[in-house]
């Protein structure tokens, strides 16, 4: 089996959206061992979509499409596949009722134009979409498979994992495939790969690294005769990866960086107060987005003025972290101070950052210097602060636990 990925939508070819779906699917197909022949984007034009589908039909046995299955007149993927295969397109009453129920569950009435999303051809098996109104298609015809999914990334990814992959497995040798992602922070992608390169080369599972906004993710793909064997292989590889990456690993799969920090606070029974000074409040935003933030985050103070030139930022941060904790009546205090001075160009601004964490066990500080655009400086400092806070909390909780047991 080989594959073609076709991303459909005018917004992809006029520069308004980046085709992240194709990148995701390329990685997923590689993990399944399915060679990808080519990837293309095409606008919302019926003739062009049919033309690209015909080419894909000639070049590969698996065609994966995303986009073009919404409710509007320019959503034409269903019509194009029907034309390609010369099959009639009709409304499926059961699908229509599911779409009506989706709206009703949210206290809404389904707009009539959404009825077209319930259309299907005879060779199509509908793919459920529990988080959207657009069912996908799984089509088997003349030795080919067409998988049609929404263009919304979160809908597409869930449909791919829960609906498409299980249906594809019998065609690629059967068995079970399971995935797990280890999330790391504080190590660059090249350093992560350096630490685990032999595991990548020798493991029975596929291991790949991806640089993300919240650190470097290590994706494990386990293909085994059954689900139990696949899970055991995931566990085995995860243990080996954790042994190499150590405390840089902050979670797996759905774990967020903010959630990992709050979990450490909860484990110790501590609360936190934050002062961010000219830093863009990146870390405060990261924590505030978490459902459990209110349990552990006492206060967050945002200062927007430029820090003074005539002071040591590290000493100011140390003092500020302690005073922040005392003022809020919290167990821990965090201070983030950023000073950005102009460079020869905006992209060469000089940023200095001082971080300090006060815990019941100790006060620790760290400084950074970076030359970049001010927005990038603040983004990087936010990640550094998250990593620094997490490690400080981890170390402090270990110290307290050791002292208590002694």
Swiss-Prot record:
Membership in a protein family: Belongs to the CinA family.
Protein name: CinA-like protein
Domain of life of the native organism: Bacteria
Pfam family, one: CinA_KH
Source organism of this protein record: Thermomicrobium roseum (strain ATCC 27502 / DSM 5159 / P-2)
InterPro entries xref list: CinA, CinA-like_C, CinA_C, CinA_KH, Competence-induced_CinA, MoaB/Mog-like_dom_sf, MoaB/Mog_dom
Gene3D superfamilies: 3.30.70.2860, CinA-like (3.90.950.20), MoaB/Mog-like domain (3.40.980.10)
């Amino acid at each position: 089996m080989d594959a073609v990925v076709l991303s459909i939508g005018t917004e992809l070819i006029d520069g308004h959206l980046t085709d992240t779906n194709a990148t995701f699917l390329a990685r997923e197909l590689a993990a399944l061992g399915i060679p990808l022949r080519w990837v293309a984007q095409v606008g919302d034009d019926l003739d062009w979509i049919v033309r690209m589908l015909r080419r894909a039909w000639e070049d590969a046995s698996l065609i994966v499409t995303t986009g073009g299955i919404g409710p509007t007149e320019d959503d034409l993927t269903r019509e194009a596949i029907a034309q390609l295969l010369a099959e009639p397109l009709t409304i499926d009453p059961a699908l229509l009722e599911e779409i009506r129920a989706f709206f009703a569950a949210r206290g809404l009435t389904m707009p009539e134009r959404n009825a077209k999303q319930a259309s299907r051809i005879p060779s199509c098996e509908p793919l459920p979409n529990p988080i959207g109104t657009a069912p996908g298609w799984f089509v088997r015809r003349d030795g080919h498979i067409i998988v049609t999914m929404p263009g919304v990334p979160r809908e597409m990814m869930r449909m791919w994992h829960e609906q498409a992959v299980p249906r594809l497995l019998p065609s690629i040798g059967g068995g079970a495939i399971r995935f797990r992602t280890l999330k790391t922070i504080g190590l660059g992608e090249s350093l992560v790969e350096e630490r685990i390169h032999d595991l990548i080369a020798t493991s029975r599972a596929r291991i790949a690294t991806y640089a993300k906004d919240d650190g470097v993710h290590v994706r494990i793909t386990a293909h085994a005769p059954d689900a139990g064997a696949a899970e055991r292989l995931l566990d085995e590889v995860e243990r080996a990866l954790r042994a190499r990456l150590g405390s840089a690993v902050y979670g797996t799969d759905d774990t967020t960086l903010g959630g990992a920090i709050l979990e450490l606070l909860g484990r110790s029974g501590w609360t936190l107060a934050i002062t961010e000074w000219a830093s863009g409040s990146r870390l405060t935003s990261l924590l505030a987005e978490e459902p459990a933030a209110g349990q552990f985050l006492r206060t967050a103070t945002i200062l927007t003025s430029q820090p003074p030139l005539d002071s040591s930022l590290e000493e100011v941060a140390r003092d500020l972290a302690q005073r922040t904790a005392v003022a809020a009546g919290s167990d821990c205090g965090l201070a983030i101070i950023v000073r950005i001075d102009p460079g020869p160009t905006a992209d060469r601004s000089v940023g200095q950052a001082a971080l300090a964490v006060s815990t019941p066990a100790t006060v620790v500080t760290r400084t950074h210097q970076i030359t970049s655009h001010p927005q990038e400086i603040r983004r990087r400092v936010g990640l550094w602060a998250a990593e620094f806070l997490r490690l400080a909390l981890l170390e402090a909780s270990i110290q307290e636990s050791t002292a208590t047991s002694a």
